[in-house]
Structure formats: C-alpha cells, structure tokens
Amino acid sequence: MRVLLVLVACLTYFSGGALAQSCSSYSGDNCPSTCFQGSYDIPCGAQVKYCTEMKDNCGEGGDVKCWKDGSNLPVQTWSSCVPSELFGPNGKFKPSEIPNSSNCPTNCENGVEWVNLCGLSCDAKTACCPDVCQCKGGQTSGGSTTGSQTSGGSTSGGSTTGSQTSGGSTTGSQTSGSQTSGGSCSNTQCPNGFYCQVQGNNAVCVPQQSSTSGGHQNDPCDTVQCPYGYSCESRDGFEAKCTRDEDEPTHRPTHRPKPPHDSDKYLCDNVHCPRGYKCNAKNGVAKCIAGYEIPRVCRNIQCPTGYRCEDHNRNPICVLEERENPDNCLTCNDVNCEASGLVCVMTRARCKVGAAKCCDVQPTCIKPSTIAGSTIASIASTIASTGSTGATSPCSVAQCPTGYVCVAQNNVAVCLPRPTTTTGSTSDSSALGSTSESSASGSSAVSSSASGSSAASSSPSSSAASSSPSSSAASSSPSSSAASSSPSSSASSSSSPSSSASSSSAPSSSASSSSAPSSSASSSSASSSSASSAATTAATTIATTAATTTATTTATTATTTATTTATTTAATIATTTAATTTATTTATTATTTATTTATS
C-alpha cells in the first residue's frame, strides 16, 4: 500500500512539473495574462516581442538600456523584466553603455554635420544608435571636437562616425552623411530635420529650427520609442529616459518627428502614436501623451485600429473610439415594411470590430405579433416620427397577421390586435374612460352628449328607453359614457336622424303610436334596448382594444375607428327595428279598422 502511495505521489509530482509551463516558453504574441509581455527594439524600426515572468516592478523603472550581440548591433530595452535566456549573464545580449549625444562643436572650419553612430541611414533609430554632431570633414580650428575626436591633423574627405583620429589617420567606418563638392548644395543630401546651406563656399547641413550651425543640441528623445505608459524625457540633453506618465499614457511615436520652420502645430503630422495615446507638440518636441488610462486587463490586448480596450467586469473588450456615420445611413423611409404587414423600428446596429465606418442605428422590420400592445403604439409613433410613407391607402397593401387588424394612422398602416366581443368589464371600461378623458376630442364631446341626452329624454320613447334595464345598464357603464363622449357616438344615441325620425317624428308612427300606446312603448323599448345593446357591445369592443395599448395616439385612433363602426351599426339596427315596429303597428291598426268596418 505504501509503495502504491509513493508511486501516485511521484506521478503527481512529475506530471505537475511537466504541465507547469514557464513564461519564457511562450512566444511574444501568445503571452498569457499571468506573464509579462515586453519587447526590445532593433535599430531601423524592428521590434521583437518576448514573454517572461511577471514581477512587481515590471516597467516601473523604465530606464533605457543598451545591449549588444555578437554582430555588435545594439538593441534597446526599457523594462527591468527581461528574459534571462536573452539578457542574462549567459544570454545572447551583453550590456552596453548608452552613447553620449553631445552638443555640436562651435570651432568647426567647414561647419557641422550629423551622422549616425552605427552607420544607419533609416529614420527609426534608437537611443543606442543616435545621430551625433561633428565637424564637417573632421577639420577644427583648434581644440578637440565632441562626437568625432581628433588629435592633430584632419580627416581626408568623407565623414567619420564617432571615431577617433590620431595623426591624420582615421579609425572607424565612413557613413553616407552630407558630402560636399565644390560648396554646392545641388549634390548634397542632408539628414531628416536639416537643410543644406552654403557657408563660406561650403555646403553645410544645418538644423531646420536654427539658421546657424552653433549651439544646436540634438534631443535624445527624437530617436527613442518609449512603450505605452511611458514618455521620453531627456536629462541634461545627454540621456533619454522613459518615465511613467501620471495618466498612464499608452502611445509612443513610431517615426521621428520632423521639426517645422515656424510652428509646433505641424510637428505631429508625421507622428503615429499607438492606441490610447495622442501626440502633443510643445517647444519643438513631439511627444505621445496619455489619451486615457489603460486597465490592467488590457495590458496585453492589441485592439484593431480605431478601437481601444476597456475593462468590462474584468474582461477586456475592444470598443470603437470614434465611430464615423456614413452619409448613406438607412432610415424607415428607405424600407417598406408595411407592404409586408410588418412595422419598422430603428434598432442599434452591431458594428463589426475593425469597421472604419458604421451606422449607429438601422431600420428593422418586425412582426407586430411579437410585440406587446403598449409597444405597438410606440412603434406607430416611431414610424410617424421617421416619416415613413406607404401607398395611397396604407391598409390596402398591408397584410396583418392572424388576429390583427390594419388601422391607418398618419398615412401609416399599423397592425393592432383584433378586438374580441365580450361583456364590458370595469377595468377595461375604466381604461377606456381615462383614455377618452385625456383626449381633447373626447372632452369636447361630453357637453354635446349631455345636451343630446336631455333632448332625447323629452320624448316618450326616449323616456321609456331610459327606464329599460338594458338602457340603464348602458348609461351607467363607464364604457358607455366613454363611447357617448365621442361625437359620432353622441349622434347615434341622441341626435341620429334615422333613429329620431323613426321613433318620434314620423307622421305615420305618431298616428299609430297614439292609437296603441302600449305597442308603441314596447316597440320603442325594444328599439332602445337593441340600440343600447349595440352601444354596449361597441363600447366593450373599444375598451378591449384600448386596454391593449397605453399610447394616447393609438388609443384615440382605435376608439374613433371602433366608435364609428358601432355608431353605424347602432343606427342601422335602430332604423330597422323602428321601421319594422311601425309597419307592424300600421298593419294591426288597418286590420282592426277593416274588421270593425266589416262588422258594422
């Protein structure tokens, strides 16, 4: 048993050790968040990423350090967290001192020139391979020059790069610096930031910020690329140091800025700062300063161009910094959802990561059946506000789903739930009553309804109708009150020409009604009962429709539409019933008269 336990422990130990992978085994592009991702710069813009163990002070120091490999080509680092396999005692690179970029000498007979210490001709140099200022041709008027030290004699043509001459012989390599031929600038190529000027029959490359060759100091930060979170600062004009910004900047220049002649506002034209940084020009120096604070989870996240990383619940996501809306963003005017029985709403667009341009919102056709009643009103108002127009008769081309009816609103076809015929409920009636009272048309129609009711009460048939149970129920129901508050409903209950004429003002009806009061009363009661039942049903239908929407516009439209239908139906029923009653009464009277005459 003990042997088995020992074997299990050994297997666990060795398997755990085998599975444990060091940070140095990862490539720079696949460095996990538990490790530190750094990089070192090779002259002429090349950058190599690496992955190493995370420490507490990774990047806190920010000191620029130079290293050299077997090819004697210096590389530049700025973090204290470097892989020991490359920068350790037995690593590939060995420490090297940062070259001293000194002031230009003032005792040069033929002017000065700038040459690269490593013999590089590219723009993206590093602090380990800076440009140094030296006397043109190595000739001085006494003393020694800095950068290209001489000890008697002069160089025989060309230019030396940081080399020492002794007794007229030069040691070191020649560079492709500015060479003159007969004092002409026609065949002289000056470095970036300098222009050719003839001085004493000699072509001299002078800085663009200064017209004289003396007193110019080369800023070491012109050739330093600091990582994001750091800015380059020069100390005494000799040493470049990447220090942490207060706002934790995230950009660094990728190209050496070209100083302009007159203003700082053009310094940032050729400076491309990384994500989260913006270029700031001050005192002739272009620097990349912080645009926003970078969350910790975004340290190793590379977002596409135009996007920045943000922390959402400790998860890094790439969000668009500034989205530009194209000129041809679609609206509901450009789509015809109503022709297919759908409604158009503007929804937020899902812009793909990396998209240069993307509309913030886009029109979307949706089914009304998937939306609640309260949303239908908002959809209708959205369509009306966007100015979407359909055909001449919107509902003639609209095909609403099953259970929905088309209602034209502001020349827009809106699919509303089809009303169901049920008995009036208190809640529905209350909802309709409150909706009708809130509308201006409903409030203005209350007085006309009251006057119509008082006029109708003066006639016997109206009095009989008011005494009937169905009429009483209709008048006491809030929904009936709401229905009568609309102009069309008021006309149907009190001032309808057909109903009024047939019930009280028709001559034959009056004559026959006077001879048979009970029959007239019962007929009037039946007519009023039928009209009241129709009005109650119509009011209930309106209340049911209004209960499914909360928007005032849609409720008013539905109420007006349903009330108009109810009014027409009630008037038709009342006219038909009254005519039938009158005909029956007339026939009965005629039969009685004929019988009496025949008997006599």
Curated annotation (Swiss-Prot):
Signal peptide from the UniProt entry: none
Protein name in the entry: Spore coat protein SP96
Principal localisation: other
Region ranges (Disordered): 139-178, 420-530
Biased composition (Low complexity): 161-178
Gene Ontology CC, one term: cytoplasmic stress granule
InterPro entries recorded: Dict_spore_N, Fol_N
Organism: Dictyostelium discoideum (Social amoeba)
Keywords on record: Glycoprotein, Phosphoprotein, Repeat, Sporulation
Processing after translation: Glycosylated; may contain fucose and GlcNAc-alpha-1-P-Ser.
Subcellular location: Spore wall
Occurrences of domain Follistatin-like (ranges): 184-206, 220-243, 267-289, 297-319, 331-359, 394-416
Stretches assigned to the DSCP-N domain: 21-140
Pfam families, A to Z: Dicty_spore_N
UniProt GO BP: spore wall assembly; sporulation resulting in formation of a cellular spore; stress granule assembly
GO molecular function terms noted in the UniProt entry: DNA binding; mRNA binding
Record flagged with keyword Magnesium: no
Record keyword Plastid present: no
